[in-house]
């Protein structure tokens, strides 16, 4: 029987070590995990874990546990030591705080050891745990650490202590794009550049499988070269396989958030990378326009505009935006299904907006940025806002009574870009000493090889540098040659233009002289004519005196009148010609001046060009000499380089042979090692097999021998008993013998096999010995090769030394050769100089020849000019003769004109009479004007006097109030004076009312006139339509006549001609009618425009009068209250009561409230600005004044009717999320009717309220779905309605601004109260006001709430709006955005 092979090892076999085999592989894997910086159990994570455990357990309450105490006793000291050795905040000097947020701040720091500047971000662990979100920073850390992209801000290291997380990042001194947009008006060229860089940066983030979700200018930083990098990756989210993201909360900044992300707050948040392209569209719009496209003062307004983006997106008319830019913005700000970029970044890159000649998508980062920041030092932080010091107490974790684990969420945060831990330890340790020695030797050889290669590369670099120098010199020479050629061509062109200009100048001078002569001649003629006219007039006067009695002279007078008319006509023609000549003379003189200035400029340019040419020639000569010297140096250097290259090539060949030998040795070594291992395995296998077989055979033999012995004993005992049976069993005995023989043969075979195995083992031992010998030989060879390498390195070093010596010798020899062969070189240089001089002289000779030819040409031109001048002189002489003849003729004419004196005399009399009439009219107008001015000044004086009287009266009133106990008589006098003043003021009020009525009547008249003009316009339009119909009918008739087929026999040429004449007549009539119609249209349009302007002026005057009347009313009201107070004071003084009982506890009279409040001004899209106004609340009006002077002058900025007030309430952070958090307790809001406002016209339009399509109607409310990231409570259940990162779905009414959970609406709960606001939201406006303190705010709100009418009045269709313009108005006054309605005041 055969047994199965044993499973265990042989008792005599050696046991393997625990680190060998599979165990070593596992250890290597574990070590790789510890070394990997991305692994969650790397060295830094393990140290963080130990550190955080000690920090979380080191509390008195926890130390009571024995196990915790033992753990702390064991690890506390070593952890403290680790903390001391790790990086900490004390390793950096803080330069400045450059940013602050909800979780911490960003500091500009300098590393103490390296003196490098970084930006260090501090995140408070307490704040992150408190706000139940400590995971957002992981994405930011991982992206900045492992991105390795030029578009992402790099993280150098991250560490932590018990309070803060620290991220040391690269410092971006250019600041963010918000700062750039606030300092510059960004042109489209810049916007194109920065948008392209943002696109590439987002593509880098998307290629990492992430979506940013908070793309805005605040997160776009500029480096020292002005190029853009993205930052703040806390909102990033990993995409799934389809490139989409599942998220149930809206993440991002309100102005830049996309509609699909807003919709995610309902629970169906499924969107992709296209949400980032939406933000890019908003960013581009903001750069070009200066404002975000969906701006609103409240979150609700912003979100509603984003959801209704198809209607709310519009481009302002006052800013110029190209078609491509508008197209790109519209392509980004659209639904995600059709948004640009949904199919990849390539479709964005192909958009025509990005086409330009300066950069492309591949080299944009290498090109110069539009704005490169001007930095004074490496710590220049001028592009960041100054941050105030945070004086608040730093909150920390409370001491726990049980294990909390506050430090556990931050394990693994520590990171170092250049991690030195475990850097020197080898990747795998082997137990074999030979292999470690070999690896060390191979490392040494590799180091030497690296050194040799570095030496070689340095030599190659030196060679390349020399070649580059030569190339640069050659390029410079070529450039200078080209510049010289260009200068020569320029000079030639300038000279030619000079010649042309000189010719033109000469011609113009000639023309000018001619025109001057003609003008002088005409002036002489005019003078003569005027003298003649005067003489004729004198004669006329004489004749008039003589012939006053006679009536016969009328015919002569008529004749003279005709002659005088003719003379006047001649005079006019002469004066016209004289004026024309003067104009032509002036124009020619201007042309001459321009030509002279051009000539001077060209001469200056010529001089500059000549100087530049000389400089260039000098530079050319210097460069040629430098080139020759460089060529010599180059040839010399090339010889040295060739020698060195030869030596280097030899050394390289030696190195190659050495490397080849090393490689062969290593290969043989590996092969022998493999053979050895194979033989050892075979040997061990054979030994095991042989021992097993021997054991089996021995066992079988022993069994057989035992059986044989027993059978023999049995046979011997039974021989005597069974003698008769021996014969029968002889055959069995024979068989047994046969079996014995077979067993013996098997035993011999096994012994033979054993002998063969022993022989094989001996052979293998021999082979092993031989291989060991070979290995030793190879090791010796390796040692020899190492020695050869060392010798080679020594040789290389010797060669380098020799090379240095050779170079020194060469320098010495070159110096000697230079000194010895100076004469030869000088001769050669002189020869070269002479050759160059020869060349230059030849060039100069050719140039002089050219100049001579040019001079000859100029001489010819001058001769031509001289001939022309001679010709002109002859012409002038002939013209002078002709002029003399003309003069003689005109003298004859003058003599004839003298006979026509009487007509001229009559005309002069009539003209004199007309002049007297006009003079009298002018005098009367001037008198009227002076009277009006005097009246105006008198009125102003009266106004000033009245104001002064009121002031004096007030002063007297105050004095009398103080001295009321002394004299009751004085009080009575003041009472009388006050009553008289009140009467005067009442009269003034009546006058103003009368004026107002007059203005209203005038307005109604103007409206009637406008209506009549409109009716006339309608009539003319009807006439125009009739004319057009008649025209079309006539054209159709003509077409019929033209297309009508008539028989040839009937027709004749006369009929055709007659019809053509009729047609022409009709056309002429049509043209004349059209001209008349257009003239009438223009006339009536002008009249209409004038009427509209008059109406506008009248309405402005009316509003001004109304506002002054309101202010006067408030003054009268105040005076009446003071009078009442005086009467009460007089009564009380008679009874014996003390003064000042009339006022309430708050210090203001019950009927009057006044003080300083601030109105919002929108300086930018990020924050509110405020402007102070003096506000007075009377019983009927709220008056706003720019200053106290305006108050005294009764010039209010704005007036609100108290009857039109709807609501007054304090605001929350969600209502004014752009305002500073410190200002919110001091802000309150007024809601009022649109028609209840009188105000100076703002410089921007008030936006209309959106449609009701996106609102949920319930109990009179108009709810808008929204989210609250700021502290807010539900007004239905009073539970929190906000969360920093995952806020619950909420609703806000756009009418009363009540806020509640969306679940109340979905579950149809009756908790929500009905809407309290009953007014029409489209006719309502709101106004934010800032008080000086919270107490004042409460006082203003409480007092104004009392004045609100219980039922607001219906809006007046004919109520006044306020188109009055004034330069005093503040720009961007924030009484805008009617969509931002605030909630009603909560019950106090």
UniProtKB/Swiss-Prot annotation:
The lineage of its organism: Eukaryota, Metazoa, Chordata, Craniata, Vertebrata. It comes from Mus musculus (Mouse). Residues 92-354 form the Protein kinase domain. Residues 357-425 form the AGC-kinase C-terminal domain. Highly expressed in brain, heart, lung, liver, stomach, spleen, kidney, testis, muscle, embryo and placenta. Isoform 2 is expressed predominantly in the skeletal muscle. Protein kinase which is a key regulator of actin cytoskeleton and cell polarity. Involved in regulation of smooth muscle contraction, actin cytoskeleton organization, stress fiber and focal adhesion formation, neurite retraction, cell adhesion and motility via phosphorylation of ADD1, BRCA2, CNN1, EZR, DPYSL2, EP300, MSN, MYL9/MLC2, NPM1, RDX, PPP1R12A and VIM. Phosphorylates SORL1 and IRF4. Acts as a negative regulator of VEGF-induced angiogenic endothelial cell activation. Positively regulates the activation of p42/MAPK1-p44/MAPK3 and of p90RSK/RPS6KA1 during myogenic differentiation. A zinc finger (Phorbol-ester/DAG-type) spans 1260-1315. Activated by RHOA binding. The gene is Rock2. GO terms for molecular function: ATP binding; endopeptidase activator activity; protein kinase activity; protein serine kinase activity; protein serine/threonine kinase activity; small GTPase binding; zinc ion binding. It is an enzyme of class 2 (transferase). This is Rho-associated protein kinase 2. Belongs to the protein kinase superfamily. AGC Ser/Thr protein kinase family.
């Amino acid at each position: 029987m055969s047994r199965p092979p044993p499973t265990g090892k042989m008792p005599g076999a050696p046991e393997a070590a625990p680190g060998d085999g599979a165990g070593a592989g596992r250890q290597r894997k574990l070590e790789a995990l510890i070394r990997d910086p991305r692994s969650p159990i790397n060295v830094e994570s393990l140290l963080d874990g130990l550190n955080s455990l000690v920090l979380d357990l080191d509390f008195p309450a926890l130390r009571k546990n024995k196990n915790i105490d033992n753990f702390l006793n064991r690890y506390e000291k070593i952890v403290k030591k680790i903390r001391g050795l790790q990086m900490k905040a004390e390793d950096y000097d803080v330069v400045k705080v450059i940013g602050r947020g909800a979780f911490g701040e960003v500091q500009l720091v300098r590393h103490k050891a390296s003196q490098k500047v970084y930006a260090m971000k501090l995140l408070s662990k307490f704040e992150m745990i408190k706000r139940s979100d400590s995971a957002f920073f992981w994405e930011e850390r991982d992206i900045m650490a492992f991105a390795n992209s030029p578009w992402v801000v790099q993280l150098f290291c991250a560490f932590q202590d018990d309070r803060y997380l620290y991220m040391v990042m690269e410092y971006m001194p250019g600041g963010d794009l918000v700062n750039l947009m606030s300092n510059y008006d960004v042109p489209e060229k810049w916007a194109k550049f920065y948008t392209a860089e943002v696109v590439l940066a987002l593509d880098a983030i998307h290629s990492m499988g992430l979506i940013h979700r908070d793309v805005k200018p605040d997160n776009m930083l500029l480096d020292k070269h002005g190029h853009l990098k993205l930052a703040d990756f806390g909102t990033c989210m990993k995409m799934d396989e389809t490139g989409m993201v599942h998220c149930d909360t809206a993440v991002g900044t309100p102005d830049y958030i996309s509609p699909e992300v807003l919709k995610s707050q309902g629970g169906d948040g499924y969107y992709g990378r296209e949400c980032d392209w939406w933000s890019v569209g908003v960013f581009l719009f903001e750069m070009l326009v200066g404002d975000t496209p969906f701006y609103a003062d409240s979150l609700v307004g912003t979100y509603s505009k984003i959801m209704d983006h198809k209607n709310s997106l519009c481009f302002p008319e006052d800013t110029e935006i190209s078609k491509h830019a508008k197209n790109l913005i519209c392509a980004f700000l659209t639904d995600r299904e059709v948004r640009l970029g949904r199919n990849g970044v390539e479709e964005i890159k192909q958009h025509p907006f990005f086409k330009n000649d300066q950069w492309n998508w591949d080299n944009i980062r290498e090109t110069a940025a539009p704005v490169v920041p001007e930095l004074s030092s490496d710590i220049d932080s001028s592009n960041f806002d100054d941050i105030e010091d945070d004086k608040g107490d730093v909150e920390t974790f409370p001491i726990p009574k049980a294990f909390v684990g506050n430090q556990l969420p931050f394990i693994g945060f520590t990171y170092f870009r250049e991690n030195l831990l475990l850097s020197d330890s080898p990747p795998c340790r082997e137990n074999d000493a030979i292999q470690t020695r070999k690896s060390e030797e191979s490392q040494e050889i590799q180091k030497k090889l690296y050194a040799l290669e570095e030496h070689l590369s340095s030599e190659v670099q030196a060679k390349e540098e020399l070649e580059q120098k030569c190339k640069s010199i050659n390029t410079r020479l070529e450039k200078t040659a080209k510049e010289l050629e260009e200068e020569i061509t320029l000079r030639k062109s300038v000279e030619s233009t000079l010649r042309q200009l000189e010719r033109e100048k000469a011609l113009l001078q000639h023309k000018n002289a001619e025109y001057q002569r003609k003008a002088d001649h005409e002036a002489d003629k005019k003078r003569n004519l005027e003298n003649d006219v005067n003489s004729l007039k004198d004669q006329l006067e004489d004749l008039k005196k003589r012939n006053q009695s006679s009536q016969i002279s009328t015919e002569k007078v008529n004749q003279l009148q005709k002659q005088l008319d003719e003379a006047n006509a001649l005079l006019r023609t002469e004066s016209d010609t004289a004026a024309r000549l003067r104009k032509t003379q002036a124009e020619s003189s201007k042309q001459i001046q321009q030509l002279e200035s051009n000539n001077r400029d060209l001469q200056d340019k010529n001089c500059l060009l000549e100087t530049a040419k000389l400089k260039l020639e000098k530079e050319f000569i210097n460069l040629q000499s430098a080139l020759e010297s460089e060529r010599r140096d180059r040839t010399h250097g090339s010889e040295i380089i060739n020698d060195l290259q030869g030596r280097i090539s030899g050394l390289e060949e030696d190195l190659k042979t050495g490397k080849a030998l090393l490689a062969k040795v290593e290969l043989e070594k590996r092969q022998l090692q493999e053979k050895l291992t194979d033989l050892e395995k075979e040997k061990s296998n054979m030994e095991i097999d042989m021992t097993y077989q021997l054991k089996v055979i021995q066992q079988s033999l022993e069994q057989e021998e035992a059986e044989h012995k027993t059978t023999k004993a049995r046979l011997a005992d039974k021989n005597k008993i069974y003698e008769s049976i021996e014969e029968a069993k002889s055959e069995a005995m024979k068989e047994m013998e046969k079996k014995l023989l077979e067993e013996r043969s098997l035993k011999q075979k096994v012994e033979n096999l054993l002998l063969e195995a022993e022989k094989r083992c001996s052979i293998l031992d021999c082979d092993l010995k031989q291989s060991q010998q070979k290995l030793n030989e190879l090791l010796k060879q390796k040692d020899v090769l190492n020695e050869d390498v060392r010798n080679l390195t020594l040789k290389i070093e010797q060669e380098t030394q020799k090379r240095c010596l050779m170079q020194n010798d060469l320098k010495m020899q070159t110096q000697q050769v230079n000194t010895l062969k100076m004469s030869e070189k000088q001769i050669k240089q002189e020869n070269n100089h002479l050759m160059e001089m020869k060349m230059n002289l030849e060039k100069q000779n050719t140039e002089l020849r050219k100049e001579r030819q040019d001079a000859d040409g100029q001489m010819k031109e001058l001769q031509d000019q001289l001939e022309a001048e001679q010709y002109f002189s002859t012409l002038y002489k002939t013209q002078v003769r002709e002029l003399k003849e003309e003069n003689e003729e005109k003298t004859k004419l003058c003599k004839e004109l003298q006979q026509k004196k009487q007509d001229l005399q009559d005309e002069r009399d009539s003209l004199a009479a007309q002049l007297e009439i006009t003079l009298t009219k002018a005098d009367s107008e001037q008198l009227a004007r002076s009277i009006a001015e005097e009246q105006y000044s008198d009125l102003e004086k009266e106004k000033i006097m009245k104001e002064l009287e009121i002031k004096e009266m007030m002063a007297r009133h105050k004095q009398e109030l103080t001295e009321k106990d002394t004299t009751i008589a004085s009080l009575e006098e003041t009472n009388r004076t006050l009553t008289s003043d009140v009467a005067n003021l009442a009269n003034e009020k009546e006058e103003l009312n009368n004026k107002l009525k007059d203005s209203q009547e005038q307005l109604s008249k103007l409206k009637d006139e406008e209506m009549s003009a409109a009716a006339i316009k309608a009539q003319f339009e009807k006439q125009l339509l009739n004319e057009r119909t008649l025209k079309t009918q006539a054209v159709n008739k003509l077409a019929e006549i033209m297309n009508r087929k008539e028989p040839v026999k009937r027709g004749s040429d006369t009929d055709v001609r007659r019809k053509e004449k009729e047609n022409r007549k009709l056309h002429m009539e049509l043209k004349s009618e059209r001209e008349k119609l257009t003239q009438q249209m223009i006339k009536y349009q002008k009249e209409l425009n004038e009427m509209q302007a008059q109406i506008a002026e009248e309405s402005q005057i009316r509003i001004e009068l109304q506002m002054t009347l309101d202010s006067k009313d408030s003054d009268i009201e105040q005076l009446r209250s003071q009078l009442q107070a005086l009467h009460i004071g007089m009564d009380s003084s008679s009874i014996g009561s003390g003064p000042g009982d009339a006022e309430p506890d708050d210090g203001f009279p019950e009927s009057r409230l006044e003080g300083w409040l601030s109105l919002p001004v929108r300086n930018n899209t990020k924050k509110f600005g405020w402007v102070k106004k003096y506000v007075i609340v009377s019983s009927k009006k709220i008056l706003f004044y720019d200053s106290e002077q305006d108050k005294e002058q009764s010039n209010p900025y704005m007036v609100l009717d108290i009857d039109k007030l709807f609501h007054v309430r304090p605001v929350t952070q969600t209502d004014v999320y752009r305002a500073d958090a410190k200002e919110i307790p001091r802000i309150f809001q007024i809601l009022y009717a649109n028609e209840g406002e009188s105000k100076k016209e703002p410089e921007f339009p008030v936006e209309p309220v959106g449609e009701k399509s996106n609102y949920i109607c319930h109990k009179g409310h108009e709810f808008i779905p929204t989210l609250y990231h700021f502290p807010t409570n539900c007004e239905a259940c009073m539970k929190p309605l906000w969360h920093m990162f995952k806020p619950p779905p909420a609703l806000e009414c756009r009418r009363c601004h009540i806020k509640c959970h969306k679940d109340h609406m979905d579950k149809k709960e009756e908790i929500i109260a009905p809407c309290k606001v009953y007014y029409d939201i489209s006719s309502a406006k709101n106004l934010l006001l800032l008080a000086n303190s919270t107490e004042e705010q409460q006082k203003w709100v409480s007092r104004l709430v009392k004045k609100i009418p219980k039922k607001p009045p219906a809006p007046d269709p004919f109520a006044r709006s306020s188109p009055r313009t004034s330069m005093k108005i503040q720009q961007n006054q924030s009484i805008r955005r009617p969509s931002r309605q605030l909630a009603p005041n909560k019950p106090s």
